[in-house]
Amino acid sequence: MIRFEIHGDNLTITDAIRNYIEEKIGKLERYFNDVPNAVAHVKVKTYSNSATKIEVTIPLKNVTLRAEERNDDLYAGIDLINNKLERQVRKYKTRINRKSRDRGDQEVFVAELQEMQETQVDNDAYDDNEIEIIRSKEFSLKPMDSEEAVLQMNLLGHDFFVFTDRETDGTSIVYRRKDGKYGLIQTSEQ
């Protein structure tokens, strides 16, 4: 069962908003044979120009579903978030079920329901079943700090840069966010 943690910035989360979010995003449960125990982290932020930003993150066992949307209409934004999350689940479901069938395991996700196929509009310009890697590169990771990695990324004109963090000796990634600022992903072994 998906539980919800809903937080509002500059906005009070009313029962109507909470119910709408839970109803829409809760429909993702229909894609699973065994509904996972998961917590959907939902953050709703309003800006001075009345635009809203909705972020939803659902960490599952082997994948994290995440979608973000800005919209002038909160409810329309929630609908768009739901569509993005459903596309992510369908893509992931297809890959996992194919691997499960090849190994003879029980499928983790349910098969496509007829009503979902009828109501769905496919916004993807490519086949969800086929992942094609068109280019592969190999390079050595150089030890540096995150600031130097950002400079290297900008020099190369890339949106991300992989490097060995000099402080932790682990692999890290810096990336350019949509807002123009930078993010850092640090890896760890489990």
From Swiss-Prot:
Keyword Cytoplasm assigned: yes
Cited CDD domains: RaiA
GO terms classed as biological process: negative regulation of translational elongation
Classification via InterPro entries: HPF/YfiA_ribosome-assoc, HPF_long/plastid, RHF-like, RHF/RaiA, Ribosom_S30AE_C, Ribosom_S30AE_C_sf
UniProt GO cellular component terms: cytosolic small ribosomal subunit
Inducing or repressing factors: Expressed by 2 hours growth, increases to maximal concentration by 7 hours and remains high (stationary phase) (at protein level). More protein is found in cells growing under nutrient-deficient conditions.
Record key words, sorted: Cytoplasm, Translation regulation
Annotated compartments: Cytoplasm
Signal peptide: none
Coiled coil spans: none
SUPFAM superfamilies: Ribosome binding protein Y (YfiA homologue)
GO molecular function: ribosomal small subunit binding
Pfam families from the UniProt entry: Ribosom_S30AE_C (PF16321), Ribosomal_S30AE (PF02482)
Function, as annotated: Required for dimerization of active 70S ribosomes into 100S ribosomes; when added to monomeric 70S ribosomes stimulates formation of 100S dimeric ribosomes. Unlike E.coli, 100S ribosomes are present during exponential growth, peak during early stationary phase and then decrease (shown for strain NBRC 3060).
Family (UniProt): Belongs to the HPF/YfiA ribosome-associated protein family. Long HPF subfamily.
Subunit field text: Interacts with 100S ribosomes during exponential growth, as 100S ribosomes decrease (after 7 hours) also found associated with 70S ribosomes.
HAMAP family in the record: HPF (MF_00839)
Protein name: Ribosome hibernation promotion factor
